[in-house]
Regions:
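A short, well-structured beta->alpha microelement
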Residues: 26-41
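Extreme N-terminal starter segment of soluble prokaryotic enzymes
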Residues: 1-4
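FMN-binding flavodoxin-like domain, especially the glycine-rich phosphate-binding loop
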Residues: 7, 12-19, 24, 28, ...
Length: 145
């Protein structure tokens, strides 16, 4: 089984978390592919997505991920074979805290993709080691596979 780790980041925090989770998955003998803001054609046929994203601006996806989800929303592709989970990074000082997670969940669910576990929302104001925090959540994702 191949796990497609997809990151969307503005300042790099989500990329670091995605890279860390991919390394942890590799040490547990999972086959992985890591994409930072991929082209949709690169990942659309994969069956398992682990999306790590920050929230940008007024609750938006980062610029390197937003166009892909706009493509998904505009397409008529059935994603019922896709299983996914989302890790989000955000700042709870904003009322749009981790709103990008909600956008990913909504857009994928509207295309019949299946969320396999609860999303993780990391508050960068209160969590100093975001990579470890995400790693501590990872068994939920693995168990759901």
């Amino acid at each position: 089984m191949n796990i497609c780790v997809i990151s969307g980041s503005t300042l790099g925090g989500a990329e670091y978390v995605a890279e860390h989770l991919e390394e942890v998955l590799k040490t547990q003998d999972f086959s992985t592919a890591l994409f930072h803001g991929p082209e949709l054609d690169d990942v659309i046929d994969e069956n398992i997505w682990l999306i790590v994203t920050s929230t940008h601006g007024a609750g938006e996806l980062p610029d390197n991920l937003k166009p892909r989800f706009e493509q998904i929303a505009a397409s008529d592709k059935d994603l019922s074979s896709l299983r996914f989970a989302v890790v989000g990074l955000g700042n709870s000082d904003y009322d749009t805290f981790c709103h990008a997670v909600n956008k990913v969940e909504t857009q994928l669910s509207e295309k019949s993709a299946v969320k396999i576990c609860e999303s993780l929302k990391i508050d960068v104001l209160h969590v100093d080691d975001q990579e470890q925090f995400a790693e501590d959540w990872l068994p939920q994702f693995i168990h759901a596979l």
